[in-house]
Amino acid sequence: MERGTVLIQPGLWTRDTSWTLLYFLCYILPQTSPQVLRIGGIFETVENEPVNVEELAFKFAVTSINRNRTLMPNTTLTYDIQRINLFDSFEASRRACDQLALGVAALFGPSHSSSVSAVQSICNALEVPHIQTRWKHPSVDNRDLFYINLYPDYAAISRAVLDLVLYYNWKTVTVVYEDSTGLIRLQELIKAPSRYNIKIKIRQLPSGNKDAKPLLKEMKKGKEFYVIFDCSHETAAEILKQILFMGMMTEYYHYFFTTLDLFALDLELYRYSGVNMTGFRLLNIDNPHVSSIIEKWSMERLQAPPRPETGLLDGVMTTEAALMYDAVYMVAIASHRASQLTVSSLQCHRHKPWRLGPRFMNLIKEARWDGLTGRITFNKTDGLRKDFDLDIISLKEEGTEKIGIWNSNSGLNMTDGNRDRSNNITDSLANRTLIVTTILEEPYVMYRKSDKPLYGNDRFEGYCLDLLKELSNILGFLYDVKLVPDGKYGAQNDKGEWNGMVKELIDHRADLAVAPLTITYVREKVIDFSKPFMTLGISILYRKPNGTNPGVFSFLNPLSPDIWMYVLLACLGVSCVLFVIARFTPYEWYNPHPCNPDSDVVENNFTLLNSFWFGVGALMQQGSELMPKALSTRIVGGIWWFFTLIIISSYTANLAAFLTVERMESPIDSADDLAKQTKIEYGAVRDGSTMTFFKKSKISTYEKMWAFMSSRQPSALGVENIGGIFIVLAAGLVLSVFVAIGEFIYKSRKNNDIEQKGKSSRLRFYFRNKVRFHGSKTESLGVEKCLSFNAIMEELGISLKNQKKIKKKSRTKGKSSFTSILTCHQRRTQRKETVA
C-alpha cells in the first residue's frame, strides 16, 4: 500500500465512516494540501528601456517568500504582472479590471498619481486592498479606505527637514523644487519664517530641460550657500555634475537632498571636495538580516544586463525597490494570519465587492513587521505609514556615513557631534591649496627686500608668514598669500556691509586670514576665529619727542612747503592786482599841490614797487604808510589783511608748538586725560577694531573721544586745513575789480568836462590839461595840449615830454612868464608819476 492512500473494505462502510470521510475532505485535506494566493502588479514602463526596478523587487519578494516556507508554509504566492505606459490612466483601469477578474488578493502599483487614482477608485469600489509605495498627496475629503502607503508621510518628512535646518542654525535657506508637489512635501519648512528667524528663497528647476547652470549661476551670485533640493535621484545625480562644473562643490556650500536614495548615488567625484552634503535614508542597513537581503539583491542585479547611466551605484537597492519588497511581505503576513482566505473573481461592471475584502484590509493595517525600511506600522484611519525612523547621512571622504537619526515621535537625534573627529579634521586639509588674505603690517607681514624679483609667497616675510609656514608643514596644506585689495582689516558700515579681510572671508574669496586681526563680538557673528596667537588690549600710543636741536630753517616747519609757495604767489598776485586797480580807479589820483586847487597835475602813490611794498608790509604785520583811498583798492587791502591775519596766527600757534615740543612732559596717563584735552590730536586705524570699538561704545568717555577723532583729519597743517582762506582772497580780488570798473564809470559820467566821442567816450580824454604861456604885454603865446587816455603808460610818457618841452621854450623866450608851471622834482619823479 502506497503512502497517503485510504483503503475501505466492503462491508465496513457505516454512517460513522461517512461522516469521518466528509470531515477529512472538508477540513483536513484543505489544511494539508498547498494553496495558491495570487496578487497583481501594474507597473509603468518606457519604450526601449529595461524593466522597472519596482517590478524586479516585486518578483524578488515573491520568490523569496516562496523559498522561505516559514512565513507561508501551506501557501504558494503567485503574481500577475501588467505593464502600461506612463500617465495612461485608462490603460491602468483596464489592466486592473483584468487582474480582478482573475482573482487577486491585492493590487500593487502603479506609481504616477493619475494612474494611481484610477486604480484606487476601482479597488475602493470592489473592496480589494490597493498597495502603494510612492508618495501621494491625500485629498482633503479622502474616502479611500482600501489602500495603504508604505512611503513615509510627507508631513513627517517636512518636519524632519525643518528640524535639521534648525539644528544647523541656518538663517537663510534656498529651496529648489522639481515640480509643484515639492512645495506640498515641504510645507512645514515653507511656513517656518512665520515662527522662526529663517529667510527662505524658493526656486524651481527648469522643466523639461536638465540644464540648471543658469539657476546655479544666480545662486552663486546671490551667495546662497544653504540649499535644499527636492527632486528625484535621477535629477539629483545630474544636478551634482552641474554643481561641480560651476565650481560650487566647495566646503562653503551645504546641500540637502530630500530624496531617500542619496546613499545609492555614485558620489565618488565629490568625496574629497569638502562639500557638505546631507540627506535621509530609510533603509535599515545596520540590521544584519537587512544587509544579507540587500547583498542577495545586489548579486542578482550584477548578473543582469547593464542598465543605462542613472547615476546609481552598481547593484544597489533603491528605496523604491525596498518599499515594494516590504509591501509584498506585509500582504504575505496578513494572508498568513487569515484562515481560509478565498479569493473570488470580480467584475468591474457588476460592482459586486469582494466579501472578504474588508477583513483582509484590516489584517494588513494591523500587521507589524521590521522590514528593509525599518519598523512598519500603519494608521488604521488613513492607511499612511507612521512611527518610522529616518537615518541622517552625510558625505565624508570615506563615503556616506550616518550622523544621526530622526523619529516621528522623538524627533532629531544627532550623533556625529559626539564623535572624536580630530584625525579627520587634520587630514581634511592635506593636499589642499588655501587662499590666504592678509594685510601689510610690520612686523607681522612685510615685503621681503631682495635684489632679485620675487613672485608668489616669496614676496612677503614676517611673523604671520612664519606661523603660516609652520601650520602648512604640520597639516600638509598649500597656500597662496594675497593682500586684501582695500588694505583694511574689516569693519561694518551703517548698512551692515563689511569691508577688508572680513569681507574677503564672507564672500569666500579667501579661505583663511592670517593677520593681526582683533577678535571682536561683531566679527565673530560672521566669521570664525582660531586660538589667538597674541593677547592685546587697546593702548594709547604717542610719540616721544626726539632730542634734536632746531635747525637754521626750523622756522619753516609750522607750514608745509605748499603753503609757503602759495603765500608767496598770493603776495605777488595781490600786489599786481592792487597796482592795476589803483591805475584804473580815478579815486587813487590826487592833486600833489593842495594849495593850488586849479592845478591839473595828479599823482598816484601805488606804483608797482609801492604795491609790492604794501603787500610785504601787511604780510609782516608792519604796515607801509600807503593807504588806499578808493573802495576797490580798500577791498583788496582788507582782503589781504584778513588773509595775512589767518596765516600769521596759524603760523604763530604752530611755531610755538614746534619750539616747545621738547619741553613737554607726558600729560596723558589715562583715557580720561586724553578725552579732556584738545591740544594733542589722536586717532585709530581706519576700519579697524579699535575704531569700531570707539564708534559703537556707549561709555561717555569713549563717545567723547570718538567725536573728537571723527572731527579731526590725521594730516599736517596743509592746503586742506587753511585752503579756504585762499578762496576768500581770490573772491575779494574779483570783487575789487568789479568795484574799480564801477568807480570809473561813475566818475566818467560825473565829469562834464570830458569829451565823449563815439563808443570809446568812457575811456578817452579823461584828463584835459591846459598849459597857457604868457609873453610880454604885447605878445602872448597860448599852448594847449590835450592828452589822449588810450593807455595809462602812454599818458605817463606824454606827460614827461610836455614837461621837457615847456622847459625848452622857457629858455628860448626870455621874456616869457608862466602863469602856471607844472614841474616835478627829480626825486619825486622817480617815486611818483605825474600827469600834466
From Swiss-Prot:
What the entry lists under InterPro entries is as follows: ANF_lig-bd_rcpt, Glu/Gly-bd, Iono_Glu_rcpt_met, Ionotropic_Glu_rcpt, Iontro_rcpt_C, Peripla_BP_I
* Residue ranges that the UniProt entry lists as topological domain Cytoplasmic: 583-638, 743-836
Bilayer-crossing regions: 562-582, 639-659, 722-742
The protein's matches in SUPFAM superfamilies, at most eight in alphabetical order, are given as: Periplasmic binding protein-like I (SSF53822), Periplasmic binding protein-like II (SSF53850)
Write out the GO biological process terms. Answer: adult behavior; behavioral response to pain; establishment of localization in cell; excitatory postsynaptic potential; gamma-aminobutyric acid secretion; inhibitory postsynaptic potential; membrane depolarization; negative regulation of synaptic transmission, glutamatergic
Chief location of this protein within or outside the cell = membrane
* Tissue/organ expression: Most abundant in the cerebellum. Also present in the suprachiasmatic nuclei of the hypothalamus.
Superkingdom is: Eukaryota
From which residue to which does the signal peptide run? 1-30
* Residues noted as binding L-glutamate in the record, renumbered to the chain: P516, T518, R523, S689, T690
Q: Note on file?
A: The postsynaptic actions of Glu are mediated by a variety of receptors that are named according to their selective agonists. This receptor binds domoate > kainate > L-glutamate = quisqualate > CNQX = DNQX > AMPA > dihydrokainate > NMDA.
Q: Which PANTHER family match?
A: IONOTROPIC GLUTAMATE RECEPTOR
Write out the function statement from the record.
Ionotropic glutamate receptor that functions as a cation-permeable ligand-gated ion channel, gated by L-glutamate and the glutamatergic agonist kainic acid. L-glutamate acts as an excitatory neurotransmitter at many synapses in the central nervous system. Binding of the excitatory neurotransmitter L-glutamate induces a conformation change, leading to the opening of the cation channel, and thereby converts the chemical signal to an electrical impulse. The receptor then desensitizes rapidly and enters a transient inactive state, characterized by the presence of bound agonist.
Q: How does it assemble?
A: Homotetramer or heterotetramer of pore-forming glutamate receptor subunits. Tetramers may be formed by the dimerization of dimers. Can form functional heteromeric receptors with GRIK4 and GRIK5. Interacts with KLHL17.
What is the name attached to this protein's record? Glutamate receptor ionotropic, kainate 1
